From Swiss-Prot:
<feature type="region of interest" description="C-terminal">
    <location>
        <begin position="64"/>
        <end position="152"/>
    </location>
</feature>
<feature type="coiled-coil region">
    <location>
        <begin position="153"/>
        <end position="169"/>
    </location>
</feature>
<comment type="function">
    <text>Positive modulator of ATM response to DNA damage.</text>
</comment>
<dbReference type="GO" id="GO:2000774">
    <property type="term" value="P:positive regulation of cellular senescence"/>
</dbReference>
<comment type="subunit">
    <text>Part of a multisubunit complex that groups tRNA ligases for Arg (RARS1), Asp (DARS1), Gln (QARS1), Ile (IARS1), Leu (LARS1), Lys (KARS1), Met (MARS1) the bifunctional ligase for Glu and Pro (EPRS1) and the auxiliary subunits AIMP1/p43, AIMP2/p38 and EEF1E1/p18. Can interact simultaneously with MARS1 and EPRS1. Forms a linear complex that contains MARS1, EEF1E1, EPRS1 and AIMP2 that is at the core of the multisubunit complex. Interacts with ATM and ATR.</text>
</comment>
<dbReference type="GO" id="GO:0005737">
    <property type="term" value="C:cytoplasm"/>
</dbReference>
<keyword id="KW-0648">Protein biosynthesis</keyword>
<dbReference type="GO" id="GO:0008285">
    <property type="term" value="P:negative regulation of cell population proliferation"/>
</dbReference>
<dbReference type="InterPro" id="IPR042450">
    <property type="entry name" value="EEF1E1"/>
</dbReference>
<dbReference type="GO" id="GO:2001235">
    <property type="term" value="P:positive regulation of apoptotic signaling pathway"/>
</dbReference>
<protein>
    <recommendedName>
        <fullName>Eukaryotic translation elongation factor 1 epsilon-1</fullName>
    </recommendedName>
</protein>
<feature type="region of interest" description="Linker">
    <location>
        <begin position="57"/>
        <end position="63"/>
    </location>
</feature>
<keyword id="KW-0539">Nucleus</keyword>
<feature type="modified residue" description="N6-acetyllysine">
    <location>
        <position position="138"/>
    </location>
</feature>
<dbReference type="Pfam" id="PF21972">
    <property type="entry name" value="Arc1p_N_like"/>
</dbReference>
<feature type="modified residue" description="N-acetylalanine">
    <location>
        <position position="2"/>
    </location>
</feature>
<dbReference type="GO" id="GO:0005730">
    <property type="term" value="C:nucleolus"/>
</dbReference>
Length: 174
């Protein structure tokens, strides 16, 4: 999914009126937001953070200094590890690392949903939708987290709902 489409989903989930003008710049198609009253903003994380502040939902950026740093860390992870990596090996490594991290966590940063969860959900959707049942079981913690995030009101929107089986079908899947 193109960054502009993700940013429009984020706008809607934040309750912002549509109408921002997005474009893409350079070979890597880095998103750019044309602002009315200032310079253009560039980069998925920068624009998403701006939208959260515009919607007065700063709690999505973390409530403590540590949570804010963790949200930024996961936004960086999203841009550096998820975007532009489409090989099967890259995807498997990414999901394995994320699965280990989520072993004892409900959210990526802290005890509530944050912008990091939302943007990582949008970024991973294209990979998760193609996983087999066995692969979803292999990455059980990612599957649990993803299923939880997709059921938040206004997050999934028009993206396809991904079905996760509650009872394990395969033994020793990880």
């Amino acid at each position: 999914m193109a960054a502009a489409a993700e940013l429009r989903l984020l706008e809607k989930s934040l309750g912002l009126k549509p109408g921002n003008k997005y474009s893409a710049q350079g070979e890597r198609q880095i998103p750019v937001l044309q602002t009315n009253n200032g310079p253009s903003l560039m980069g998925l994380s920068t624009i998403a953070t701006h939208l959260v502040k515009q919607a007065s939902k700063e709690h999505l950026l973390g409530s403590t200094a540590e949570e804010k740093a963790m949200v930024q860390q996961w936004l960086e992870f999203r841009v550096t590890r998820v975007d532009g990596h489409s090989s099967k090996e890259d995807t498997q490594t990414l999901l394995k690392d994320l699965n280990s991290y989520l072993e004892d966590k409900v959210y990526l940063a802290g005890h509530n949903i944050t912008l990091a969860d939302i943007l990582l959900y949008y970024g991973l959707h294209r990979f998760i939708v193609d996983l087999t049942v066995q692969e979803k079981e292999k990455y059980l913690n990612v599957s649990r987290w993803f299923c939880h995030i997709q059921h938040y009101p206004d997050i999934r929107q028009h993206l396809s709902s991904i079905v996760f089986i509650k009872n394990r079908l395969y033994a020793n899947s990880h």
